Amino acid sequence: VTALRQYLGVWRIPGAPMLLIFGIIGRLGIGMTPLALLLVVEQVTGRYSLAAIAGGIYALAGAALSPIAGRIADRVGPSPVLLLTAVAHPLALIGLLLASRSGDDALPVIYLAAGVAGATYPPLSAAIRGAWNDLTGPNSGRYHLRNTALAAETTLFEIVFVLGPLLVAGFVLVADAAAALIGAAVVTLVGTTTVALGQVMRGWRPHPQEHHARGLGPLRVAGFPALLICVAGLGIAFGAAGVIVPAFASDHATGDPESLAGVLLAVWGIGSAIGGLWFGVRKPAPNMTRQFALLLAALAATFAVFAVMPNPLALGVALIAGGATIAPALTLENTLVGRIAPTGMLNEAYTWVVTVAVASSAAGGSVAGVIVDHAGGVRWAFLFAGAAVAVGAAVAALPAGPIARAETTAVRAEHPVPV
């Protein structure tokens, strides 16, 4: 009952239903567009290697330019940036589809359109997480709901990575990959525009005495670069898991290894969702950095457990148990970003988190792909993923480390001691 009351409290925050529902609809493209783009380009060229280049250009362009969009949003507000990118991104995808009708000769244009599409992907995650920080600020009267709100955001966001590929598969089944790409463009346009025109984004106002980013922006904020190391460790592990689990399934499946891999990854996601919902109703720890370090250490240990699982059933049980640490860790990650980054740099800070997560995930997947090709590679790849998270845990665990000091400073600013 208490748990339900807390989540109902989040739902009743003005503008919250819009963020929760249309925020997920607008971000379905994160799970749809890369796969649909890969399939479209492969159909044109007949080669997955060329299609993968288009996907890489799309991802790198988005990772490189999203912090710029975040900085602009911090200065003028998120609504104008979201509206502009909500239109520009679908137009770039349509341009890519038109170019794909011209065959191999249009490959440079396809690559260009992929880059533009990636660069213009709406910074919706950053805007939404920044909005939750504003809605549950220390002076809002809802500060006690911040942990629950960010846990709900983190847990619901995982739907994107489950539902997105399923929607692409459905479009391909009834039509083709081009229809899937159009579908991704439509949900991005509708969801982002709706959020941008909602009362939360339109009601954005600059915070008094806020510090706008200059130069390296939040990268110069004490504690934030160290937090990005933790983000990178998680990204490497998640990217690696996307390669390791299918490789494990291929080694152990008696039937279709692709279906088995999908089930195992889905089970991992279910474990994360359960953990996230449970964590959202817990009282926030007085020392979030220490709690973050403990969760990262626990997650790192689960990869060592995965490495010794003898069969898919055992791995599935381990995944659902180990997955329970993921959403809580990501919730604390988002909470610490909101605490450490100045309000005038919040959107940019969250876009840096997304950028580092995407880049490190790609790196983790690439390294894991090399490792699993060797004898006993699946086991070593799991250990590699766990080691990446362990590095982040070590950084967060430093008692007088940069993250801990930054959190202490933020807590003192939120709750000043009367003189």
What are these regions (language model features)?
Residues 106-107, 172-186, 255-259, 370-389:
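A membrane-interface helix-boundary motif in multi-pass transporters
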Residues 87-104, 298-310:
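C-terminal ends and interior cores of transmembrane alpha-helices
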Residues 64-78, 172, 274-288, 372-373:
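Helix-to-loop junctions at the C-terminal end of transmembrane segments
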Residues 344-375:
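A late C-terminal transmembrane helix in Major Facilitator Superfamily
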Residues 2-63, 214-265:
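Helix-loop boundary and gating motifs at the non-cytosolic
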Residues 113-157:
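Cytoplasmic helix-loop-helix junction between adjacent transmembrane helices
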Residues 122-138, 245, 328-341:
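Intracellular juxtamembrane helix-capping segments at the cytosolic ends
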Residues 289-333:
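C-terminal transmembrane helical hairpin of 12-TM major facilitator-type secondary transporters
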